[in-house]
Amino acid sequence: MKVERSIEIAAPPDAVYDVVMDPERLGEWVTVHDSLVHAPDGVLEQGDELAQRLKIAHKCFNVTWQVAVAHRPRDVEWEGRCPMGTKARVSYDLEPRGDGTCFNYVNEYELPGGPLGKIGGKAFQRTAAKEADRTLVKLKGLFER
């Protein structure tokens, strides 16, 4: 399953990159973020790993993320391991637009459970899409107050 979203942010890609790659700032913009379990200090680099507690639809669970790609200030890819064998891949493309950034977000994930997982997956996808929209609006708000 896949969720894709984009938003224009009135800040240069370097500034946006610094925020989205700082684990201590996740709570400021990621709506499903509950807490950090562990993470390195400062701006993350390729190969770094963090564990995050997420809360989606009143359910909490931990996800371990590895930064698979980090090409400052343009491209980021995360690989996530979730409970019950669920895998996720999230990418950010920070496209320069004049003095600002077009932040392109893609979240691809595989839910366990075969056909039953796919049925429940449709509801999960709707929730994930709604939260992606809310998250990107919060990120934009950090720069456009």
Give the role of each language-model region.
Residues 1-45:
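Hydrophobic ligand-binding cavity/cleft-lining segments
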Residues 2, 8, 66, 77, ...:
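Conserved beta-strand segments that form the floor/walls of ligand-binding pockets within enzyme
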Residues 2-4, 60-64, 86-91:
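Short, surface-exposed coil-to-beta transition loops
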Residues 31, 73, 85-87:
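A generic structural motif
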Residues 37-83, 97, 102, 134-145:
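Glycine-rich portal/gate segments that line the openings of hydrophobic small-molecule binding cavities
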Residues 79-134:
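Beta-strand/loop substructures that line and gate deep hydrophobic ligand-binding cavities in soluble
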